[in-house]
């Protein structure tokens, strides 16, 4: 059976990439502190020796919108196009092409039915910075297959917090029941230092707490 090699909660702050790669006067004063914190997370993931990354994030209205927003969605594709035009323009993020792990996706979708989750799926999912930024920060080689799981945190009605807790427990159980001799790292992503839709949305904020 598969093993949960690590569980990590990490930022998907879209400004990290530009801040960490800037030099001279363009480099913000908090960049070095930010890089040091991210390096510690990266070392944790490297020590775990994962074979697969199970990425739990959210779509920022790139592919899913107010009129079509599943509460919980699993990507089920052999490959994923990653990052959108506005993310390249606004944040300087590179376009990525990431390999999927379809066997684990299928196992989660089938097994989810027995754990109280009728999970939506997409065979044509294109992912955004909620998945790519943690890969850039924690696994910049981008060499591991992924399973993206999108959660609805934007379009009311939102799931209750208890459902997110239950989903986390279900994902762990499903990974551990997957009949594959592989190590899976589960990475939950988000950030606390931006005010989405508010006056501080694009302010000069540093590292997440």
Where are these regions (language model features)?
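Active-site beta-strand/loop microenvironment that shapes enzyme catalytic pockets
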Residues: 159-208
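A generic structural signal for alpha->beta connector loops
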Residues: 4, 143, 181-183
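Glycine-rich phosphate- or other oxyanion-binding loops that anchor nucleotides, phosphorylated ligands
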Residues: 123-179
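Beta-strand elements within well-structured catalytic alpha/beta cores of enzymes
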Residues: 51-57, 149, 182-190
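A short aromatic-anchored loop/beta-hairpin motif
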Residues: 1-111, 115, 119
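Short connector loops/turns at beta-strand edges and beta->alpha or beta->beta junctions
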Residues: 11-16, 152-154, 192
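Flexible, glycine-rich phosphate/dinucleotide-binding loops
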Residues: 62, 155, 195
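Catalytic cores of processing enzymes, dominated by hydrolases/peptidases
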Residues: 105-147, 194-209
